[in-house]
A protein has these predicted regions:
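Glycine-rich, phosphate-binding/catalytic loops in enzymes
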Residues: 80-86, 228, 260-262
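Solvent-exposed, conformationally flexible loop/turn segments
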Residues: 252, 256-268, 272-277, 310-315
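Short strand-edge motifs at loop-to-beta-strand transitions and within beta-strands
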Residues: 7, 267-269, 340-342
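Substrate-binding/access-modulating region of protease and related hydrolase catalytic domains
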Residues: 169-259, 277-291, 297-300, 320, ...
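Generic recognition of flexible, low-complexity loop/linker segments
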Residues: 51-54, 126, 148-151, 230-231, ...
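Surface-exposed loop/edge segments in extracytoplasmic proteins
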Residues: 302-308
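Autoinhibitory propeptides
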Residues: 1-63, 70-86, 344, 348-354, ...
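Subtilisin-like serine protease catalytic core
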Residues: 52-186, 206, 289-290
Length: 366
């Protein structure tokens, strides 16, 4: 248990996770998250607020939690004049060689004193940031002022609690068709990272703002998944706030929203598969009490007519001559916030325009 009606369970299994795996409900398999940083800082207006002499908000006495790819601790933006670090505590989930944080089962914890000493000695064991995404977010949030370079973080006097997330496990990367070389973390590690940051803030007796610059295409975006529920509970507590990426994929074409009206038989969604795309998962979320079914047309012209899937039913379909495999499963809405979900897992995809036909039945229009 990690609190607030949320628990994480680890199960040792030799069997890979598949689309037909009936051991787990939809909402019990961790989702994978990717990086979502945006550099449009001036557009938020936050720098003007921070610069206002009447307000003078600089973050003194507060903490900012960075849960991301890590941080380049040796950067001057994160060091005081005496060489000590602005990072009061760091949990490296990817390193199993050191002392774990109290109450956690993996990773290595670094205190401010250990970090500062490691920087002075140029200790190669210090956690880093191979990607740079977490360092960027930390600099924007709490980087110290550099007058010569004209730079300042939003809250330059705030201090940092950092979690370097470990990357998603192999079985999840395979299940979600995440290519090699693409950074990805998993939902349960993020939830534990949030718990860690808050535990540090509580020990120090300081308010904390937690920055999550990660996101996922999966889920209903309705606040019903594990991480969203956990954040919703915690955000009601005093001295805890969250800053979360949203809207970063507004023009990327990864989402579709539609209404099937009573006079319509179905709606068509075109999705373009690029060269080199080996596979992906697509989800259809529908509002109850309506029931939704789908059909699919491949670029080669093979038409899979309307599939009447029962709740919980799984089907495996092979497209010829493309040799694409589609694993499709319908999930009942009772377990995931009142929405029907149809999950489509495409493997060995061929490029071109695919068509998804969405049928709705019921008294409503959505």
């Amino acid at each position: 248990p990690i609190g607030y009606n949320q628990s994480i369970v680890y199960i040792k299994s030799k069997n890979p996770l598949t689309g037909d795996d009936r051991r787990f409900r939809y909402d019990t398999v961790p989702k994978c998250y990717g990086l979502m940083a945006s550099e449009e800082l001036e557009e938020t207006g936050i720098l003007k607020v921070r610069r206002s002499p009447q307000l003078g908000y600089r973050g003194s006495g507060t903490l900012i939690g960075i849960i991301d790819t890590g941080i380049r601790l040796e950067e001057s933006l994160f060091l005081y004049e005496d060489g000590s670090s602005k990072v009061v505590s760091l949990w490296d989930q990817s390193d199993q060689s050191g002392i774990r944080p109290e109450g956690f089962l993996y990773g290595t914890e670094w205190t401010r004193e250990e970090i500062s000493e490691g920087i002075k000695k140029k200790d190669k064991k210090l956690p880093g940031d191979e990607n740079g995404h977490g360092t960027f977010l930390a600099a924007v949030a709490a980087g110290r002022e550099d007058i010569d370079k004209g730079f300042s973080g939003i809250a330059p006097d705030a201090e940092l609690v950092v979690v370097k997330l470990k990357q998603s496990k192999k079985y999840l990367r395979e299940f979600y068709s995440i290519p090699d070389g693409i950074w990805s973390c998993q939902e349960d590690d993020v939830m534990l990272a949030v718990r860690y940051v808050i535990s540090v803030a509580n020990k120090l007796g300081r308010p904390v703002s937690i920055c999550l610059g990660i996101g996922t295409n999966l889920g209903g975006h309705n606040g019903a998944n594990g991480l969203a529920r956990y954040i919703s509970y915690l955000s009601l507590l005093p001295k805890i706030s969250f800053h979360i990426a949203g809207g970063n994929e507004g023009i990327s074409g990864h989402h579709f929203h539609g209404i099937i009206r009573r006079e319509e038989q179905y709606q068509t969604v075109d999705f373009n598969v690029a060269e080199g795309e080996n596979g992906f998962i697509m989800e259809l979320w529908g509002d109850e009490p309506n029931v939704y079914t789908v059909g699919i047309l491949s670029p080669g012209g093979e038409n899979i007519e309307r599939m009447q899937l029962k709740m919980g039913e799984f089907r495996s379909i092979r497209f010829f001559p493309e040799n694409t495999l589609l694993e499709i499963r319908s999930f009942p809405g009772a377990t995931i916030g009142g929405s029907q979900v149809i999950r489509m897992n495409f493997k060995n995809l061929v490029p071109g325009i695919w068509k998804l036909f969405i049928y709705g039945t019921g008294n409503g229009e959505k």
